[in-house]
Amino acid sequence: MQNKGIVICVAVLLTLASIFYLSFSFATRYYDSKAAELKDPIAQQNYKDSVKYLGVYSYQNCLETQIGLGLDLKGGMNVILEISVPDVLENLADHKTDAGFTNAMREARAQEEANGGDFVSLFINAYHKSAPGHKLAEVFATQQLQGKVSPQSSDAEVEKAIRASVQDAIDNSFNVVRTRIDKFGVVQPNIQKLEGQQGRIMVEMPGISQPERMRKMLQGSANLEFWETYNSDEIAPYLQQLDTRIANGDNGEEKTDTVATDSAAAKKAVAKAEPKKAEGKFSIKKKDDAAAKVGEDAQNAAAIKAHPLLARLQLAGGLSTVGYASVRDTAAINKIIYSAVAKRVLPSDLRLLWSAKPADHLNVKNIYELHALKVTTTTGRAPLEGDVITDAKDEFDQMGSPVVSMKMNTEGARKWAQMTKANVGKAIAIVLDGVVYSAPRVNGEIDGGSSQISGNFTIEDTKDLANTLKSGRMPAPARIVQEEVVGPTLGAQSIQMGIISFVVAFVLLMVYMVVMYNIVPGMMANLALLVNVFFTLGILTSFQAALTLPGLAGMVLSLGTAVDANVLIYERIKEELRSGKGMKQAVAAGYGNAFSAIFDSNLTSLITGVILLVTGTGPIRGFATTWIIGIIVSFFTAVFLTRLVYDYKLNHDKWMHCKFDTAVSHNLMQGKKYKFMSMYKITFTVAIIAAVVFISSFFVRGLSKSIDFTGGRNYVVQFESPVEPEEIRTVLGDAFVNADGTKANTSAIAIGTDGKTIRVSTNYMIESNNPAVDDQAETILYNSLKKAGLVSQENVDAFKNPDVRQGGSIISSTKVGPSVAKDITMGAIYSVLFALIAIFLYILLRFRNVAFSLGSTIALAFDALTVVGFYSLLWGLVPFSLEIDQTFIGAILTVVGYSINDKVVVFDRIRENLKLHPKGDRQQLFNASINETLARTINTSTSTLIVLLCIFILGGDSIRSFSFAMILGVVFGTLSSIFIASPLAYLVLGRKIKAEPAEEVAAVEAK
């Protein structure tokens, strides 16, 4: 063996690096156990702060460098944030209102929603259609793009500036998100921009137990504004007239009547509507009080018909609060106050915004305040914004209530002093992300740049708000378009299941190798497997990649790849020994002859793994990462490390009489002369019939598509007692109703075998961008199940807590927005096509004949069709989920990777025999090549199936569908190598070769 020194050097470096990185995991566990011995939490933290691993690394360094666990193993939250590119463009255009720009934005949004695509390109095309003859510079020669775009700039220059600014906004948003998460204290977060998906950021936060806080923190743009306000008595008459005009059926067309604005009418209107109170304090103590009637009036059809606005909105007097309303009425009120009628009736400089929290001085729950803000700038923006804030702290006021104190820079302090001086006796509204957090009365000029946000806050609220303000403002709004929440208890169960399946699969593989190849070769292969796992974990830790349940599956599957390499080598050695060679020569020839098959099969699998890594997200990337590492490591350990050991032993005259078989495997598939090629008509007919059945099933039964492809929400609910999915479907059938009055699609399927775990799927208001819809959906689910007596939790918060299992709870949840679902669908199609094309080209490059490329690609397509076809035929008939989701697409690509591995081995033997017998009978040559590799095919398939069956039976529900697809892929991929790929290659290759003898004769005669 050549280059032994390089192999030894690489092995030593990998060993040292793996030991170094894995040691941090042991150090962390050691320090945790020592700290746990201390009873005082402060003492525990002081101990952790004082330790230094290896004299250099702090406890925090150890925590960040140890093996990271993914969400499915540790619990936590995974979200994909989408930065609003349309909002970035509107900011760059200074919120232009001309028809050309607004129409182009509307058209681009519609096209993006319908078909996806690059929004900047969609907008530019739409603008050229809506404003023909006009240049982009007319819109974007603004203060925002000063120095980049001038009125004379060409469209190409403007587009370049826009794209650069959009990318800057995304980069800045990424940095803001990272800063917020760091301040939140998440351990080992994974934050990355998704390549090829403009404006999307993936955030993985293991260990998060408060998803509501994270949603609020991640989606908050920190757009802080200070607004002057109207007094409520100035606005009440306008609201009354708006109420009257809506009741009379006004559709917003021009009217001749005017708004009564005299002071007497205003006072009369307020007096009529205003409850008795002092300085905005609205006390509700009696049943007949005005605010208590808010809910009753809203339910009274006659009152709503007579007063569409004021039956829902209770007018108030004093300062900026113009009224109170129940949270359930806010949507209807918004529809009125933002209507075309309202634009004609209400003052043009009026903005109406809701309070961020329910009014804390009322004795009725979920009553919100509506505030009247006054626009005083020509641009329509707030006179003072959050970019002047230099610091924000969570503190307590004189009454002991949590507040957020802020400091401003010099310019901000100057404007703040002017603003407060001009509004003494009035309120100034402090607005964050479009809602009013507080609107305090100004008692006098405030200099020094100090301000405070107060309200109905908890300590956590003020801490998060201060962190959000300190992290900086998001350049554009961000919304969660995909989300997954996994409870820590479920994660612990996944760890247990994953470890059990891994250990059992590993032990069975070791036993199988010894049974098939005897003690010494079997244990050598097993040693290579152990080293494989050690190196894989070490490399994974050095990359700071999180280990997930699919990642564990990828590691287990890579063990199958490692076994395949050893099987190829050992079968070759057995052939050489049977030909009469000595042990040294047989081992050298075995490793040499098996190299090309191992190299090609591993490289084709690697191509598939890279495509998975590039196109996949979340669990698929975790699987692809460990699988790729496992493929590379298994190639190194099987081909080079084991060869070093054999060479060392044989050079010292050890293992000279080593046996590579046992009584079980001695004559396995030896001397067989199956005539596979003569059966191709039968096998092709069977394959065509199967394909017709599968395709027919697609039209008749379809596929069970998950929310990954349809968009929606999944809630995995664990009940105290067994329940039937049909009962859940009945209970929830009418519960989820969209804003337009249509029923949302809702389904329920059983998870596991105990009957206590049900997954509820719904597309309830999935198109809405309102973050509050997430909470609404969970509340509807809780109320419906509670009313039916299926859960007994006291409140929705306990129901949403995955650690509170008694009484029933949501143990995990997933959300996929419609735009993400479309991208996932297209990504799935492209990834499978790219894999097939890449493999076709590689086989063509390596085998230099299109016959092998065609045979392998068509067979791979049939393998994929077979797996998908069985999912179509069997969903709803087997006791586990067969939904088509991202993990399933990963399984399809993995099937392609495994199947091509098998086909390459067969084709490699055919290629070898073609070189040895160029004039031989092609049919006999193909048959002989397949027969010669049958032992390897059976051993590899069996060992891989052992691994997959362990994952399928012991790996848990989340990975069962994946392993089932892989089992189908291994079985039918092996069969297609023999009965589809090889006959196809034979037919194409055979026809080409038949013409060669005549050509050769002609060439000879010409000479």
Where are these regions (language model features)?
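Interfacial helix-loop-helix hairpins and adjacent transmembrane helices
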Residues: M1-I67, E90-H128, A156, F640-F694, ...
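Interfacial segments of transmembrane alpha-helices in multi-pass membrane proteins
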Residues: Q2-K4, V404-S405, N409-V424, I428-A429, ...
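Cytosolic juxtamembrane regions of multi-pass inner-membrane proteins
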Residues: G560-T604, D647-W655, S872, V878-T940, ...
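Small-residue-enriched core segments of transmembrane alpha-helices in multipass membrane transport
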Residues: V12-T15, G522-Q544, M555-A562, F623-A638, ...
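Non-transmembrane, solvent-exposed regions of membrane trafficking/translocation machinery
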Residues: L22-Y31, D49, T65-M77, L81-D433, ...
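Juxtamembrane "pre-transmembrane" interface segments
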Residues: E204, G448-Q452, E460-V507, I780, ...
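Pore- and gate-forming transmembrane helices of large, multi-pass membrane proteins
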Residues: V177, T489-L509, T561, K581-T617, ...
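Hydrophobic alpha-helical transmembrane segments of membrane transport and translocation systems
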Residues: V531, G538-I539, E575-S596, D600-A687, ...
